[in-house]
Swiss-Prot record:
Cofactor(s) essential for the protein: Zn(2+)
Molecular-function GO terms, alphabetical: ribonuclease P activity; zinc ion binding
Binding site for Zn(2+): C67, C70, C93, C96
E.C. designation(s): 3.1.26.5
HAMAP family: RNase_P_4
Subunit annotation: Consists of a catalytic RNA component and at least 4-5 protein subunits.
Protein name as catalogued: Ribonuclease P protein component 4
Compartment(s) of residence: Cytoplasm
Lineage summary: Archaea, Methanobacteriati, Methanobacteriota, Stenosarchaea group, Methanomicrobia
Organism listed in the record: Methanococcoides burtonii (strain DSM 6242 / NBRC 107633 / OCM 468 / ACE-M)
EC main group: hydrolase
Length: 108
């Protein structure tokens, strides 16, 4: 029983470190995008691989900044197109053409 508790604690520590690294890589991608878009794509690719390895869910704001098709960093107007259709926001990657549809609700 004692060993399983230690393993769970160690697993949580590893996931926390991985989450911090993912957030750091996205910050670096945002800073680097204007001067070197290829490097920012690489940072997002690394963050995505870390997330898959340690089975971490990405927060919604970070999900909207990466393309699931080509692992590139998405900047509205530069590397992605954002359109509003009815009750959905459509984000289109301009590299691979993949679309993300995100529902939104208008306040009444």
């Amino acid at each position: 029983m004692y060993m399983s508790r230690m393993k769970k604690k160690q697993k949580n520590i590893i996931k926390d470190v991985a989450s911090e690294r993912i957030e750091r890589l996205f910050k670096l991608a945002a800073e680097e995008y204007s001067s070197n878009p290829g490097r920012s794509d690489r940072y997002v690719h690394l963050a995505r691989r870390i997330g898959m390895k340690y089975r971490i869910r990405f927060p919604s704001p970070l999900k909207r900044k990466m393309c699931r098709g080509c692992s590139s960093y998405l900047v509205p107007g530069s590397s992605s197109r954002v359109r509003l259709h009815g009750r959905y926001m459509t984000i289109t990657c301009l590299k691979c053409g993949r679309e993300m549809r995100i529902p939104y609700h208008l306040k009444e």
